Amino acid sequence: MDLTIVTSHWKENLEWLKKSKFPVVLINKEGADPTCFEPQSTVPNRGYETLAYFKYIIENYENLPGHVAFIHGHETSWHHMHDRPLMEVIEGANIQKYEYIPLNNFFRYYHFHDEAPNLESAPSGMKLKTLWYRLGFPPVPDGCMFLLAPSSQYIVSKKRILAIPKNVWRTWYQVILNCSKDDELILTVFFDFVQQVIFDGNLMVNIQPDWFSFKYEPKFWHLMPEFCNPKPSSV
């Protein structure tokens, strides 16, 4: 498999990645903890993993591997919803057939509008519609339905990355780098949500049963009581 793992890193323990059969490229955040890998680049501690992903794409645009697995750096997380370790998920990906494969097994339906401030991950609200047009994405009908693959960890082909001009990647990088602190979170969440649209080209991710060599059951936000049921207020 012509695949490279690219990981964003700040405080995560990356020892588990030493077992990888694939090359590992590290993009550090400023102030990151020491780790077992030599970073290729260091970026400001902004934009969560998104800034690191964009940095890698910009710096390696002319010599990308056949496929890139973009990951956050932690071996386990609430959004890892396959029944096996993340490395096994990457190893089982059917990249011979598919050019974009989300790795979290976590999907969310979303209407094309600006969401009120009700998500812990986006206390300022999720400005999908506002940012969609501000950043030059093509028109879509108001209120149309998206099916998204959030918490951006995915495998994507060189072909799909190169379908976006390098100057666009640079623009998106600068937008996050230079935004106000108030806008940083909603911009990061926006790119976290729409990475699937950028690479897959569809508003509704087309979930495939043979994305992986193992069987899996897709997990949906609206069917998870831990996300959809409001927590009781503390008194």
Which stretches of residues belong to each language-model region?
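ER/Golgi luminal nucleotide-sugar-dependent glycosyltransferases, focusing on the catalytic module
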Residues: M1-V235
